[in-house]
Amino acid sequence: MSNKNKKLFGVWMDTHNATIVGTEDHGTEEFKILGHVANPGADNNSNENHLHNQEIALTHKFFKEIASKMPNIDEIHITGTGQIQQQFIKYLAETPQYKNALATESTSNKMSDENIKDYIEKHFN
């Protein structure tokens, strides 16, 4: 299947921010910024167990919010800093709606929205 008929998405993410890029309309290959999602992180709590549970819950909410901006993924490329990309790929694989999506990843530094869009577009072309 050519990329023209696929729903292609890209995400730049770190532990606190994500930028979602995709081909919004079927039939167009033009990538555009679909949205931004922020993860404020856990509050400062002296109880380590509570803090850990809060971080897990907030990360899950962060992933869910990102995924909600990308219905029916055929292919996704996830890039960013750290190891959060692998966690997000695992989340997608465990979510029935996204489990058949082809996911790839890379590591990259923070970029402007325009550079993220160009980076993802270049990846799929």
Protein language model regions, located:
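Terminal alpha-helical anchor/extension segments at protein ends
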Residues: M1-N125
